[in-house]
């Protein structure tokens, strides 16, 4: 039994080194891409202001270096430090320490922008965590002088790495056992949406039979992950089939859909599962200094030369890896149970898992029609026009019609932000995003609210199949009045507010409490004279109110009940 577990859960140190290099490269690319969006998503006056993260974690404690200060200089410094640590990890300079720093900083930035969190981010965070517990600098690093001696190792960390992918594929596959995936139409639905599909994906919609076969093939691959990656029989040979198949799956996803880092970090993780026998052949043999001699690699599965992971504190390292393994397995089981029964398990599990960023959810593409969105940001201008500024600078010809075309965003992260806001989980992000349209439009070539002299905005979305979108109509995500001034709390007006007309004259002033008028409010005539004054309770007029005409003469006084 001991030899069996060693064989199944051991990884070649050279393959682990490939994981280190690939994960560092992905992190470096991701960091540079986030730096490109610093002003848009991370600075104090960005579309995702500092207080949004604070509100999001109000009742779910988190930790984040990025939430210690909203200073733009401080935020920039953390990204520069992350890029430097990623470079150290890439070349293998004090790799475990570099991996630890990368994990802390990357886990930290994920808490800064909750609406931009993706499955790919969670997977990258998980891989960085386990790299701190693996011998990732023994090969292809500055410490090893970029040599790659042969050898396999095993530990709870190697087991966790394998099980991370088995869980990811299996849970996703089980959640896809619905009509669209079983009848083979899922990929046709997904790739027909121009907001999500890349040009190759759109081209493939011309071949429905091929997409049907690919739909079933992807579902089957996900459901047999435990066999392909953990087979005790002919482990290396069957794992070879699995690694090639899953890399092919992710290449297909990457070239057909907008998924940010998910596909490339998945491929990076799969590189760590390359069997020792691969290193006997080009191009990998060019990098190695010795031939693999594992019994499993060419002849039998009865023995293994794997050794325990070398570490200064093996018991502590194994305990940490075992804890991480237990946490994400528990979260996976809980999420699968919730998905199938709609019964939510204690939030305490998710809170604990979140501190390690193991609160993973693998529901990607499980409901294809749920990914089909049509957004409209309708702005009323000072001259009475209604303009969808995400698509045009001209007046909408039919305000009730479902838009046929999707929006061309300036980057995938902007597309992600709008898609995430559809979920009630990120409802407090809707107001800042609408407000940000005043001076910056994320849609390519489209005007800002300021440029068309906009006064009010309604952000709406149609969700589902074309038939559902037409039948159900739009859901209003948020309303924003650019003429008014005041603060928001959890997406609702809160505190003192002043409301104005199109000419900038005060119409009303008073206090909101979580979106409801509360306390004394005063309304004004266009000439500035007081029109009425009184009190609100729970959003309704209450108590004595007094009204005046435009000349300032009292016209009525009495109680509201």
Where does each model-flagged region fall?
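Alpha-helical membrane-anchoring segments
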Residues: 1-483
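Glycine/tyrosine- and acidic-biased, solvent-exposed loop/turn segments at the edges of beta-strands
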Residues: 471-561
């Amino acid at each position: 039994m001991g030899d069996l577990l060693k064989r199944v859960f051991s990884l070649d140190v050279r393959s682990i080194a490939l994981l280190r290099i690939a994960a560092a490269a992905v992190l470096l690319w991701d960091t540079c891409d986030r730096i490109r969006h610093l002003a848009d998503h991370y600075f104090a006056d960005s579309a995702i202001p500092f207080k949004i993260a604070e509100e999001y974690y109000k009742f779910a404690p988190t930790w984040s270096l990025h939430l210690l200060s909203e200073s733009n200089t401080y935020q920039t410094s953390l990204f520069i430090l992350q890029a430097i640590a990623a470079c150290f990890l890439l070349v293998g300079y004090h790799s475990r320490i570099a991996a630890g720093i990368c994990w802390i900083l990357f886990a930290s930035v994920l808490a800064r922008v909750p609406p931009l969190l993706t499955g790919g981010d969670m997977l990258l965070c998980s891989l960085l965590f386990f790299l701190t517990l693996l011998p990732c600098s023994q090969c292809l690093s500055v410490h090893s002088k970029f040599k790659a001696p042969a050898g396999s190792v095993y530990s709870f960390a190697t087991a966790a790495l394998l099980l991370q992918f088995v869980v990811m594929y299996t849970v996703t596959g089980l959640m896809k056992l619905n009509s669209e995936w079983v009848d083979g139409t899922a990929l046709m639905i997904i790739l027909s949406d121009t907001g999500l599909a890349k040009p190759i994906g759109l081209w493939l919609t011309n071949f429905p039979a091929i997409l049907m076969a690919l739909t079933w093939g992807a579902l089957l691959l996900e459901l047999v992950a435990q066999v392909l990656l953990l087979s005790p029989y002919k482990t290396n040979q069957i794992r070879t089939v699995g690694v090639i198949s899953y890399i092919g799956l992710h290449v297909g996803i990457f070239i057909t859909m907008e998924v940010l880092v998910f596909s490339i970090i998945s491929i990076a993780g799969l590189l760590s599962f390359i069997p020792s026998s691969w290193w006997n052949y080009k191009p990998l043999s060019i990098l190695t200094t010795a031939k693999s001699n594992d019994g499993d690699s060419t002849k039998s599965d009865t023995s293994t030369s794997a050794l325990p992971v070398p570490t200064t504190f093996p018991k502590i390292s194994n305990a940490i890896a075992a804890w991480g393994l237990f946490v994400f397995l528990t979260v996976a089981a809980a999420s699968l149970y919730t998905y199938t029964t709609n019964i939510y398990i204690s939030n305490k599990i998710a809170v604990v898992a979140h501190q390690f960023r193991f609160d993973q959810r693998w529901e990607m593409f499980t409901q294809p029609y749920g990914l089909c969105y049509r957004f409209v940001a309708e702005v009323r201008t000072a001259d009475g026009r209604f303009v969808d500024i995400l698509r045009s600078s001209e007046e909408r010809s039919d305000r009730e019609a479902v838009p046929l075309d999707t929006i061309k965003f300036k980057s995938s992260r902007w597309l992600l932000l709008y898609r995430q806001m559809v979920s009630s989980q990120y409802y407090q992000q809707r107001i800042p995003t609408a407000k940000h349209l005043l001076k910056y439009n994320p849609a390519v070539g489209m005007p800002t609210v300021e440029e068309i002299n906009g006064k009010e905005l309604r952000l709406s979305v149609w969700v589902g199949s074309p038939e559902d979108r037409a039948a159900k109509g739009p859901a209003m995500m948020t309303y924003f009045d650019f003429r008014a001034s005041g603060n928001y709390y959890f997406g609702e007006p809160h505190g003192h507010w002043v409301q104005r007309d199109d000419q900038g004259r005060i119409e009303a002033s008073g206090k909101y409490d979580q979106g409801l008028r509360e306390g004394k409010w005063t309304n004004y005539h266009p000439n500035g004279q007081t029109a009425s004054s009184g009190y609100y309770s729970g959003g309704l007029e209450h108590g004595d109110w007094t009204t005046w005409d435009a000349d300032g003469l009292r016209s009525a006084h009495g109680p509201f009940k």
